[in-house]
Amino acid sequence: MNDLQWPLLGLFSVLIILALFGNLLVCAAILWDRSLRKQPENLFLVSLAVSDLLVSVLVMLFAAVNDILGYWPFGQFYCQFWISFDITTCTASILNLCAISLDRYWHISRPMVYIRYCNRRRINYVIVLVWLISAGIGAAPLGFGFGSKVTINNLTGLPVCEMRLPLPYAIGSSMVSFFLPAMVMVILYTKLYLYARKHVRSIKTQLQQATSFLIMQLASEKIREVTAATLKGEALLPPDSPATERTTMTVSRHYSRRSTTTTTTATPRRGDKKTSSQNKVESIRTSIFSKLNFLCPTRFKNQRSPQDPHTPAAHNRSNISDQKARLTLGVIMGTFLVCWLPFFTVNILRAWLPEIFSSKTIMAVTWLGYANSSANPLIYSIFNRDFRRAFKKIIVRVFGCCWEEPDLNKSISSRYAAPDNIERRRSCTRSSESAHDNNNDANATRLNLLSNNNEETIPE
């Protein structure tokens, strides 16, 4: 082996191991974990993992041997089947990715229709259709007697398994196997991203309108209170009066697609003491925010009271979901297009002009496509919290070890936490530390008392 073959051996080994064990782990997680098994949409992930697993076992292993040795040692018979397995399994992997994008689009954009019509039986029909189309495209070279042939290299005298596809088949199979599914995925994921942005902006607008409406209602209620007191000749206490006033406030928010209804009821009860104006405003803000926190917990989970939506902290928090959507869709589509677009472009041009590309170029774009089977378990499974939890259980059961799962959402949210939340967490920490110290002092006091009592009971 020369100096170039050793790095290739290491690279091919890493890709094969990732594809093999990653997809095995996905299948095991869905089969063993009850919560994952109950979700019908995970059947698409099982089908994707099976197709990528077959790519690693039936295609990548033999391609690695062929490219490292520089010749084909497995004979004419398996050369034909190897090319057919390559086309079938890679097409199934791409079509499964397209089916996953369709499933996610219907699940998010039309959830009621999805819940009503999408079940295990229909998902199984789609998976069977995916594999039938893939098998039909992959079996065509065997049925019509084209696609591969073992020839003898004139320079080395060693056998070489060559792929020879007619131009009509190369164009047709590339359209069905990649270009049409890629077009569908780009359109659907773009629409999903735009839908998510529109949904987030709609929620932000509704929250701003509801907050403004509540403030107007409270102001008008206070005006009516002052007017009634003036007409009755009652005295109005100044805002900084030490008297107390209890205010019971109920806020009900009902969202619909076209309207937002807010009902506010303020019942003041005057007593001998009244609270200051600042405490009243703070109690009202806290009550309002508690309702908003219930209605939109992901946005207001770490805040104590509603803030101005135009402040930098609120703006950063509102952009977290948008950044996550861009990152997720960018990783999904970026990895898919980078891996497969060069291969299918070269595939069509190679059928048209066979001598235009070198063997190294063909090997590079081929393994770039195979790398997608190694990346799919990482993209579609490990970034999912339920799958990470299932992977942890499997690894603990098999190897007897464990890891501390990082909370990505918590780390991102902590970056944009409001200063009052940080101070509150610090105060809670100081309180817990002081409580711990007090408990230690109390325990030490008890021990001293016990020791003193014991010393008194010992006879001299």
Swiss-Prot record:
Give me the glycosylation sites of this protein: N154
Give the superkingdom in one word: Eukaryota
Q: Which Gene3D superfamilies does the record associate with it?
A: Rhodopsin 7-helix transmembrane proteins
Major localization class = membrane
* Cytoplasmic membrane side: 32-42, 89-125, 190-328, 383-460
Q: Where is the composition biased (Low complexity)?
A: 250-268
Q: Where is this region: Disordered?
A: 235-281, 427-460
Enumerate the transmembrane spans: 11-31, 43-63, 68-88, 126-146, 169-189, 329-349, 362-382
The places in or outside the cell where this protein is found are: Cell membrane
- The UniProt regions of compositional bias labelled Polar residues, in chain numbering, are 440-460
| Sorted UniProt keywords | Cell membrane, Disulfide bond, G-protein coupled receptor, Glycoprotein, Membrane, Receptor, Transducer, Transmembrane, Transmembrane helix
Q: Tell me which Gene Ontology terms the entry assigns under biological process.
A: adenylate cyclase-activating dopamine receptor signaling pathway; adenylate cyclase-modulating G protein-coupled receptor signaling pathway; chemical synaptic transmission; G protein-coupled dopamine receptor signaling pathway; G protein-coupled receptor signaling pathway, coupled to cyclic nucleotide second messenger; habituation; mechanosensory behavior; regulation of locomotion
GO terms for CC? dendrite; plasma membrane; synapse
PROSITE patterns tied to this protein? G_PROTEIN_RECEP_F1_1, G_PROTEIN_RECEP_F1_2
Task: List GO molecular-function terms, semicolon-separated.
Answer: dopamine neurotransmitter receptor activity, coupled via Gs; epinephrine binding; G protein-coupled serotonin receptor activity; neurotransmitter receptor activity; norepinephrine binding
Q: List the disulfide bonds.
A: C79-C161
Q: What does the record say about its membrane topology?
A: Multi-pass membrane protein
Organ and tissue specificity: Expressed in PLM and PHC mechanosensory neurons. Low intensity expression found in ALM mechanosensory neurons. Probable expression in AUA, RIB and RIM interneurons. Expressed in the RIS interneuron.
Disruption phenotype annotation: Shows normal light touch sensitivity. Shows rapid reduction in reversal rate during habituation to a non-localized mechanical stimulus, or tap, administered to the culture plate. Does not affect the body bend swimming frequency of animals. Restores late-stage body bend swimming frequency in grk-2 background animals. Does not affect dopamine-mediated inhibition of both basal and serotonin-induced egg laying. Rescues learned avoidance behavior in cat-2 background animals.
Q: Which residues lie on this side of the membrane: Extracellular?
A: 1-10, 64-67, 147-168, 350-361
Q: Which Pfam families match?
A: 7tm_1
| InterPro entries registered for this protein in UniProt | GPCR_Rhodpsn, GPCR_Rhodpsn_7TM
Function of this protein?
A: G-protein coupled receptor which binds to the neurotransmitter dopamine with high affinity. Promotes the secretion of FMRFamide-like neuropeptide flp-11 in the RIS neurons which inhibits late-stage swimming frequency. Plays a role in modulating mechanosensory behavior in response to non-localized mechanical stimulation. Under mitochondrial stress, plays a role in bacterial preference, resulting in learned avoidance behavior.
Extract the PANTHER family matched here. Answer: ADRENERGIC RECEPTOR-RELATED G-PROTEIN COUPLED RECEPTOR, OCTOPAMINE RECEPTOR BETA-2R
Q: Give the family this protein belongs to, as stated in its UniProt record.
A: Belongs to the G-protein coupled receptor 1 family.
Q: Kindly provide the name given to this protein in its UniProt entry.
A: Dopamine receptor 1
Gene name in the database record: dop-1
